[in-house]
């Protein structure tokens, strides 16, 4: 008998999970406030509702008699997932767990209270109050919306300048629902990402990626990671400890961590799997299917055999695609053409078609697809991504806008002067 699985979100990042649920023979219900989102084309039924509308999603879930509810790549959907799971008695993170893990201010407070490594921070809903509080922080500063995801609204300010800080504050404020901005000291180090899985209170799997970032937006990942084994061990211990302290015992966990000499600092940790092709990358490199484990866990089924996450069966990488300016997509190679041209490519997910309006790649929500491929090392990664960019043959017609850049602020929400090659190069 088919299980009715509700998936929160129907964008490009949710598409692989939607396809996996279909492949497993489930009746798939997608929830999203954008009817044109690509994931709806692959589900059996869709609900036109925001994933942050707890009561709206709960009402639909009850009417449709769902058996499970999941999401991926979306922190903002986790509180809704938790609420519906609690209401219907389904597996999912607790309300308290979702509260701490989906809000940057709450997560920093949780880290501070439990004496976990974290940057010094303040938060406020008005700039004048924030300006007074941030005098206690050391420069440079990171401005972040407290309850957004996908790298939206993140700004870095180098100088304690009133005008620059004000611009950064209100730019981050645009992306909040609560109106609260989190301001924290910048941490130097090597930034890594990855996916893990909790089962019966234990971190049974944890794959750590090398992460490539441009203006705080991920543009790619690679396995194996680029940090030492001793740091990998310490990182896994930190993730396991944080999950236990926040009472997260079963389900996927996505993380971004800064690794520096003597310090492992969790930047973000979500009660869901990651987007940007990480699941495909992890499966190819380790043999562990994060999406399949997520679906099985949501249906109260055993997640199956878990491989040794310290071993990489084969090296591979992912490339997140985006355009540096507004435009109408005129031409782009198909997935089949790209695979034929580049034999290392084994997975392509494109979320746009010719004729679509493309927005600048200033956050993960504006990506146009992901490509996953085999690669030996970082040098090989750079060569293959350059080849992919060339073979994609992307051409757009420009749309003029009157947007003004945020000068002197390091922000992915300023005007992108870089071209596609620079945006996707290895940093």
Residue ranges, per PLM feature:
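Short, well-ordered beta-strand elements within core beta-sheets of diverse protein domains
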Residues: 155, 185, 283, 367-375
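Active-site "cap" helix and flanking loop/linker of ATP-utilizing ligase/carboxylase catalytic domains
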Residues: 234-255, 260, 270-330
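Internal nucleotide-binding/catalytic subdomain
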Residues: 154-264, 273, 285
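Short, conserved charged micro-motifs
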Residues: 56, 130, 162-167, 326-332, ...
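Short beta-strand-to-loop capping motifs
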Residues: 157-159, 196, 321-325, 371-377
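Glycine-rich active-site loop/lid that clamps phosphate-bearing ligands
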Residues: 321-354
